[in-house]
Amino acid sequence: QQILKSLENVDLDKELPGVQVCVIEQQDRVEALFNERYPEGLKPEDVVYHAQTAEELLMINYTSGTTSEPKGVMIPQRAIWSNMAFAKEVLPQLGGGQKVLSMLPTAHLYGMSFELLYEFIVGIHITLLNRALSPALILKALSSIKPDLVVVVPMLIEKIVRKGILPKYNSPVIKVLRKIPGVRNIVLGKFRDGLMQALGGNLYEVIIGGAGLNSEVEQVLKDIKFPYTVGYGM
C-alpha cells in the first residue's frame, strides 16, 4: 500500500498553469512521515482547506467541439457553478430518490452538467447506458427505468414524433377533431399521454439540446403541451 507524502507545485511550461505532483511513499513509512510533519501532533490549525475561486481551473475538457480538431478546453469553476445554479432554478422539483437515464457523452459539458453533475449534487439515481445507442435500445431502457428527467439530443424526439405521432396527428380525421372546441384538448391530451408513455411514463421534464430541434416537431410538442425545454443555443 502507498500513501501521499506531499504535494508540490511544478511549472512544466511557463505558458501553462502550475501542476501539482503527488509524491508517493510506502505504507510502512506513514508514522515516520506523520511525526516528521506534525512533531507535536495534529492540531485544528494544521487543517487548512483550499479556498476556491470562481476563475480557478476546474477541468481540462478534451473535445473536438465544433471545429473537428481535438483540443483541451480549460473550464473554470465559474462555468460549472453557473450551470448548476441554472439547473437548480429551472428544475426545482428534482431531488433525492428520483431517476435519470444518462445517454449523452460526459466529455460534452451538456451531458456532464445536466445528466451527471447536477444529479449527483441533489441525489438523483443515475443509470448509465454503456452500449451503442439506438432508438430501440433507448426506448426499452426508458420503459424499464421510468426516469423523472430525460436529457436527449433532438434526433431521438424527432424520430419518436415522426414515426409514432405525426402520421395520426396529420390524418384528415384528427385534423378535423383538433379544430373542434372542447374536443381539441382531449385529442391533444391523448397524444401527450402517448409520448409520455413512450419515454417511460414518469416524466417531470425532457431537456433537448446539442443541436437545433426541427420546427415541425417542436410545434407538435407545443400543441400537445408536452413538458420540454430546448437547451440548444443557451
Residue ranges of predicted features:
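Structural core segment of the AMP-binding/adenylate-forming
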Residues: Q1-F34
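Alpha-helix/helix-capping structural signal
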Residues: Q2, R78, M155-E158, A211-G212
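Conserved pre-ATP/AMP-binding loop-to-beta segment of ANL
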Residues: D28-A32, Y38-Y62, E69, Q93-K99
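Conserved S/T- and glycine-rich ATP-binding loop of Class I adenylate-forming
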Residues: L57, T63-T66, V100, V150, ...
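Conserved AMP-binding A3 loop
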Residues: L58-M84
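Conserved AMP-binding/adenylation subdomain of ANL enzymes
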Residues: W81-K99, T106-D193, N202, D223, ...
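Conserved A3 ("GATE") glycine/threonine-rich loop of ANL adenylate-forming enzymes
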Residues: M155, G209-V217, T229-M234
